């Protein structure tokens, strides 16, 4: 069985930890990279002891070179951060942003609601904000969710 190679950016926050718990129990997922900025070199179990028994990589600083080995990127980062990662996506990469970077389909709306300029305008057309349970066929056509 082919496993999806996954990278989690923002792995040490609450959302990142909960996501890692779910992914580490999924038989079709291989977590290749756990990324963070302030906890480089630490084990994820430092932040949540329930992950001690899981075979997971240590936390590393995100590097765009990782993308060539990754199928799926989850970002559990503050608003604005997934936009930067999206600029470097390869055709095979799918980005699932757990923040608000690609919720709105117009850069002007993003500025209005989030009080910051959208820095990946050209990627908005490649994104969809949808519930998988209601939009599975639509979601398959996009590489930013």
Residue spans for each PLM region:
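N-terminal Rossmann-like NAD(P) cofactor-binding subdomain of oxidoreductases
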Residues: 1-144
